[in-house]
């Protein structure tokens, strides 16, 4: 696993649209697309008609992913209604999407889920920036219910505030001229709506957890069993915090030396979510050598994964180009937890209420660029064509039973 994002749910929506284009191309040019199976004349491309795929979240072009994502929002609103009963409430409360004030280039990412929620669940979404929330939101002092523009809010979905900066007021004039963003966030966190994500996950980011989970000594201390230690150790790529740089005996000291000598083997990442932040190659060496930089200890360093490369057609702005690319597969899921405060007899706990896999997407990333991003045209969304093992065995008798769980065709 390269990373674990706790905020974005965008990819599967747009990927479903991309798969429709791929289906069209596959159907129109099936005789020219030489897939490895189907020597009996039946092209593997049409494995998408298999019943397994029709009923699966993996079905190319399927609306199942969109429905599953919307269903997770509805589940959150239902849990909210259970915890905040109100006999006068008609239908489900609204979703408040918190966005950046100046620009929001990701609007199309979540418009799909807005339409799905409204069309099939009669759930309405409202978008607002921190300043707008400061001006137009209020919390009922008795029920602790959050209202925005007079409407009850059951779920707050943060598309802004990926770092601590927007929440902190450092100058007196900021208090006079604008809202205290931290106070706005505090108001939201202390009110009743379910938060996506909660502030502890959003500000820490999962990179911090990933760093801890890659530490065998830490896992030995906190994991409940040796089996769990081994499972987690296999999932997370090697990653180190810069916080311990210079501490005697810390593993990061040797990693630091190796990263300066061989920066091509590492990524240097800030504790942020979202793209465009990673440092690579000579950028790593320059950053690591500036030991006086106060930001340095907020970074984490990760061993670089070198995936296989394939020649890929990237369709961008009405044209295309061919490049050596690698494929990144993302799995989307929903996780609901309930926090139980510590008591005299027991520590604080987070209890898992529900956990579901709700979709997937793929990106073809140009290997020649520093950090491939779809919005910059250096990566393209794509969709896999999974083929059940049984179908592969049916088409190719020479394949060993159980050798493949699924085959992905891009």
Regions found by a protein language model. Name each.
Residues 5-404, 409:
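Domain-scale recognition of functional cores that engage charged ligands
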């Amino acid at each position: 696993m390269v990373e674990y994002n706790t905020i974005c749910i965008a990819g599967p929506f747009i990927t479903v649209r991309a798969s429709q284009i791929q289906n069209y191309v596959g159907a129109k040019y099936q005789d020219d697309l030489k897939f490895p199976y189907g020597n009996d004349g039946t092209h593997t491309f049409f494995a998408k008609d298999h019943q397994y795929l029709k009923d699966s979240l993996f079905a190319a072009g399927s609306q199942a992913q969109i429905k599953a994502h919307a269903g997770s929002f509805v589940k959150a609103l239902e849990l909210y209604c259970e915890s905040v009963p109100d006999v006068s409430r008609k239908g489900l409360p609204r979703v408040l999407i918190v966005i950046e004030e100046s620009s929001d280039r990701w609007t199309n990412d979540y418009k799909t889920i807005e339409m799905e929620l409204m069309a099939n669940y009669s759930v309405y979404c409202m978008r607002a920036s921190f300043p707008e929330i400061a001006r137009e939101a209020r919390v009922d002092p008795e029920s602790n219910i959050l209202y925005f523009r007079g409407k009850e809010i059951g779920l707050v979905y943060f598309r802004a505030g990926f770092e601590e900066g927007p929440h902190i007021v450092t100058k007196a004039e900021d208090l006079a001229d604008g809202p205290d963003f931290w106070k706005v966030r505090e108001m939201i966190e202390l009110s009743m709506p379910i938060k996506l994500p909660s502030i502890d996950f959003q500000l820490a980011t999962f990179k911090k957890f990933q760093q801890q989970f890659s530490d065998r000594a830490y896992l030995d201390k906190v994991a409940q069993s040796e089996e769990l230690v081994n499972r987690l150790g296999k999932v997370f790529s090697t990653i180190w915090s810069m916080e311990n740089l210079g501490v005697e005996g810390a593993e990061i000291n040797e990693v630091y030396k190796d990263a300066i000598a061989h920066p091509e083997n590492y990524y240097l990442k800030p504790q942020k979510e979202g793209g465009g932040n990673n440092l690579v190659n000579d950028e790593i060496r320059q950053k690591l050598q500036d030991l006086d930089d106060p930001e340095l200890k907020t970074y984490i360093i990760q061993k670089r994964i070198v995936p296989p490369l394939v020649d890929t057609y990237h369709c961008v702005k009405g044209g295309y180009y061919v490049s050596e690319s690698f494929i990144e597969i993302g799995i989307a899921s929903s996780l609901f937890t309930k926090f139980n405060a510590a008591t005299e007899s027991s520590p604080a706990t987070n209890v898992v209420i529900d956990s579901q896999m709700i979709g997937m997407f793929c990106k073809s990333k140009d290997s020649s660029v520093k950090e491939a991003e779809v919005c910059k045209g250096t990566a393209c969304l794509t969709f896999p064509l999974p083929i059940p093992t049984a179908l592969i065995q049916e088409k190719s008798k020479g394949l060993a039973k159980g050798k493949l769980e699924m085959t992905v065709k891009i």
